[in-house]
């Protein structure tokens, strides 16, 4: 936490993106702070973004903008697949992704693999808007390393969602060749995976490497998509979808529209589903094309 010398009653949290760029938010209260066996965990209450989960001094999610991230990482792959029943979620200890996944009536089981149980405990206590479905009867919580899990499990999934932090520390292996090969192995023959893939402005080389590794793993369709994320570096973020069979641009929009009558969303709808791919910026499309040549 950084104290503002001019206004001593004001507390600010600052995340430094690099030596020249930072994001600061004014803090109402520090609700939770603990160092687990893996990372430093903080939950703060902010004036403009509500409660925020911070891991190792890095924003993970805030109440104000989390719906953008969690809806897009979940509903894009789950509606691209015509009948997703068995889903694996790796990471996302705040519970926001699981909350969105269980909204799908076709989903029967959600294996939720999280490395740090302390994150789940903190979010269940202080961020119930996100963690509200972790105890859903469809959800099977597994406390282990996601890298190890996909390497060892014999289970097969229709959709795998990798809700991972930045590629540093224990999470670095979630962006390496061997991990993608194991994810491919864990998917059914028509399976789909999606992964958090950083900022196209700051991390274009990383996105290209992800695309290469996914191609080498055997995926036929590889498509990054972008979206605004105010509390992430640059405010411009991405996911990368990889599919063995189904193309997200070929979904039945009427099916999505009908399903959404019984599903509350704030950002995602049938038009966003296709538009988010069609509106991909040229520099990103060019970079992906080059990576896949």
UniProtKB/Swiss-Prot annotation:
Superkingdom, natural source: Archaea
Compartments where located: Cytoplasm
Ranges in a coiled coil: none
InterPro entries the record matches: PABS (IPR030374), PABS_CS (IPR030373), SAM-dependent_MTases_sf (IPR029063), Spermi_synthase (IPR001045), Spermidine_synt_N (IPR035246), Spermidine_synt_N_sf (IPR037163)
Gene Ontology MF term list: spermidine synthase activity
Pathways involved: Amine and polyamine biosynthesis; spermidine biosynthesis; spermidine from putrescine: step 1/1
Alphabetical keyword list: Cytoplasm, Polyamine biosynthesis, Spermidine biosynthesis, Transferase
Chief subcellular location: cytoplasm
Record-annotated PABS domain positions: 10-244
E.C. number(s) listed in UniProt: 2.5.1.16
HAMAP family: Spermidine_synth
Protein family: Belongs to the spermidine/spermine synthase family.
Assembly with partners or alone: Homodimer or homotetramer.
Role, per record: Catalyzes the irreversible transfer of a propylamine group from the amino donor S-adenosylmethioninamine (decarboxy-AdoMet) to putrescine (1,4-diaminobutane) to yield spermidine.
UniProt-recorded name of the protein: Polyamine aminopropyltransferase
Protein species of origin: Methanocaldococcus jannaschii (strain ATCC 43067 / DSM 2661 / JAL-1 / JCM 10045 / NBRC 100440)
Gene this protein is translated from: speE
